Amino acid sequence: MAALAEEQTEVAVKLEPEGPPTLLPPQAGDGAGEGSGGTPNNGPNGGGGGNVAVAAAAGGDGGTPKPGVAVSAAAPAGAAPVPAAPAEAGAPHDRQTLLAVLQFLRQSNLREAEEALRREARLLEEAVAGSGAPGELDGAGAEAASALLSRVTASVPGSAAPEPPGTGASVTSVFSGSASGPAAPGKVASVAVEDQPDVSAVLSAYNQQGDPTMYEEYYSGLKHFIECSLDCHRAELSQLFYPLFVHMYLELVYNQHENEAKSFFEKFHGDQECYYQDDLRVLSSLTKKEHMKGNETMLDFRTSKFVLRIYRDSYQLLKRHLQEKQNNQIWNIVQEHLYIDIFDGMPRSKQQIDAMVGSLAGEAKREANKSKVFFGLLKEPEIEVPLDDEDEEGENEEGKPKKKKPKKDSIGSKSKKQDPNAPPQNRIPLPELKDSDKLDKIMNMKETTKRVRLGPDCLPSICFYTFLNAYQGLTAVDVTDDSSLIAGGFADSTVRVWSVTPKKLRSVKQASDLSLIDKESDDVLERIMDEKTASELKILYGHSGPVYGASFSPDRNYLLSSSEDGTVRLWSLQTFTCLVGYKGHNYPVWDTQFSPYGYYFVSGGHDRVARLWATDHYQPLRIFAGHLADVNCTRYHPNSNYVATGSADRTVRLWDVLNGNCVRIFTGHKGPIHSLTFSPNGRFLATGATDGRVLLWDIGHGLMVGELKGHTDTVCSLRFSRDGEILASGSMDNTVRLWDAVKAFEDLETDDFTTATGHINLPENSQELLLGTYMTKSTPVVHLHFTRRNLVLAAGAYSPQ
């Protein structure tokens, strides 16, 4: 048929000249049954057709639209509520809805559309021509009418359970155009919609609009019901308060009920948990519909479903309550904006729930932490270690040489047997060891033999590097693995590198001078260095914004820096110049880190994604997308097969480097995450955030296993000792704290029930695990590092109060 207006958008029903109308398929998720995998989509009344009022403004002569004429099929006033049950085929409100649509089509002279719809519904001509009486349908016609309505309802994105009869809810569609003659067959009907680009968007938005004066009553009624429930159900159902509050407030603002929205916010915002106060402050600034456009907080809530894990009996109790109260306003929000992960067994306590909630999108789904993770270490190559002078074979009193066992690399001996939890050696292509790498491993082994075994009775010494007069604003620090170099990123866009050993920093000679050097000499590596350039400090210029991240390569030949200018730069520590600028992030890059094996590195920034790079590729190899806010910190797993990211959405994610999939989502922090570190054996992960807590995670089972309380400000840095006995944490509260990691992880028994349900019981033993607290005068601790002999190096900029 001919289009009603050239500029109008297309409706979802295509009218063919022959046969019944072809409907678009239902949207994904419609019709899902109840189960533990998600939110059941059948409403509290079990489905069925609701009351529908179709308001149409048909154009008159000359194309001038007439005022909207409402053709309502609502139940008569005073009709008794229908009990909650699946609607029977051919129910009166089903027939009335179809008749209303058919009458509108007839008034608009859309004869072919009317005939096609009437044939499929098998309605009698007299019923349509009548004054709105239901008309008689045979059994097949009744089934067709019910099926047709359900299909039309399913085709609307975001459609939820319909309102029960008598509630007066309506779905309104506004049409305009010329009705001067019949439309041509085979065309697509067009609809002009006010203020929205398509009909489905209007319907979806209007479905969420209820009586603005009733929102407070709906929320208060649910709040009273939950508070009067049994203790076992109260803790479970209390999780609904925050997401329902946010979505009801956003609906009021979106539908321009500003006074009601303000009253609703002032009345109930104080009832929310304290760890949501930062989000509520942002939410309170959204007071007009125009404020919602482009607002990140609003987009997060509207585009991602808030995940709640609720005990099955508690969920059934909630569902029965909403059925009895005919509260479809709340039920629609539950369906459209929440993901209910139902579990069996036993309900969780308030403490267990509080330990896991707090993130921007709720808890993690159980399926998110079921993937197999190879957290074991790769087998190290065996390297022969030459004997030191003092270990050389001597002669005993009889003149016979002493018998000495040949030394092997302790690293190799530690991993002689393949760890069953380790990934295949060739799962990720890693760079081959160079001769210089082998020499460095030999030096590392020698240092290991002199390493102090730490414990509660043998705490490490701490050496603190204080940046004085750092008026450029220290923003990032890193130390090389052998503790010979320290780098700092500053707000004035510079990167500064210091030597912390007597050996000064030297640059390679110019090319003209290098051609004169004998390349066969034994000391060629010394000859190529220019002694005239020797100094304790080198300043690297290149960024055009503050430098927020720095990372040395394992071989100490390169340095990475990330900046507010959206780039990651690779610097040569032989020439102290920039080699490559990696451009991929669209916004500031908050952190970057090299792989333990070099070559690869990861970066994360304000654009909410982390990127995996290789030094010889100017484009990222992987993009890790999934966070709902800034990626503040990144960390490579010791086996280089995984990357951990901490975000301002208060979640930690573990990503598989092989395929880019997210294999773990950890929730529990109440503030943005700013520090991460893996245990040396690769099994555990420690995270720190602005809430001052340090959380410990079992990567294999995907569970929280510990909570360390003591810091009063953001935890900026975390490091395990070389053997994993001690965990050091540095904070903005000017303290370094040492924790007993062995005791925190000992007797860790994760049974099948805990693994399946996530019911964790965190011991309140922070004071027992705290081994020492070390105060600085007035210096926030920005970075921590354990030397190869287990000496702690800390760094920060002096900031007098």
UniProtKB/Swiss-Prot annotation:
Tell me the disulfide pairings in this chain.
Answer: none
Q: Where is this region: Disordered?
A: 1-69, 156-176, 385-438
What SMART domains would the database entry show? WD40
- GO process terms (BP): mRNA transcription by RNA polymerase II; positive regulation of DNA-templated transcription; positive regulation of transcription initiation by RNA polymerase II; regulation of DNA repair; regulation of transcription by RNA polymerase II; RNA polymerase II preinitiation complex assembly
Q: Which parts of the chain are WD repeats?
A: 469-508, 542-581, 584-625, 626-667, 668-707, 710-749
Give me the stretches of Acidic residues compositional bias. Answer: 385-396
Q: Known CDD domains for this protein? A: TAF5_NTD2, WD40
Specify whether Nucleus is a keyword of the entry: yes
SUPFAM superfamilies from the xrefs?
Taf5 N-terminal domain-like (SSF160897), WD40 repeat-like (SSF50978)
Q: Where in the cell is it found?
A: Nucleus
Domain (LisH) spans 93-125
Task: Output a single Gene Ontology CC term carried by this record.
Answer: transcription factor TFIID complex
The subunit structure is:
Homodimer. Component of the TFIID basal transcription factor complex, composed of TATA-box-binding protein TBP, and a number of TBP-associated factors (TAFs), including TAF1, TAF2, TAF3, TAF4, TAF5, TAF6, TAF7, TAF8, TAF9, TAF10, TAF11, TAF12 and TAF13. The TFIID complex structure can be divided into 3 modules TFIID-A, TFIID-B, and TFIID-C. TAF5 forms the TFIID-A module together with TAF3 and TBP, and in TFIID-B with TAF8. Component of the TFTC-HAT complex, at least composed of TAF5L, TAF6L, TADA3L, SUPT3H/SPT3, TAF2, TAF4, TAF5, GCN5L2/GCN5, TAF10 and TRRAP.
Q: Cite the domain annotation text.
A: Distinct domains of TAF5/TAFII100 are required for functional interaction with transcription factor TFIIFB (RAP30) and incorporation into the TFIID complex.
The record's function comment reads: The TFIID basal transcription factor complex plays a major role in the initiation of RNA polymerase II (Pol II)-dependent transcription. TFIID recognizes and binds promoters with or without a TATA box via its subunit TBP, a TATA-box-binding protein, and promotes assembly of the pre-initiation complex (PIC). The TFIID complex consists of TBP and TBP-associated factors (TAFs), including TAF1, TAF2, TAF3, TAF4, TAF5, TAF6, TAF7, TAF8, TAF9, TAF10, TAF11, TAF12 and TAF13. The TFIID complex structure can be divided into 3 modules TFIID-A, TFIID-B, and TFIID-C.
Protein name (Swiss-Prot/TrEMBL):
Transcription initiation factor TFIID subunit 5
Identify the taxonomic lineage of the organism of origin. Answer: Eukaryota, Metazoa, Chordata, Craniata, Vertebrata
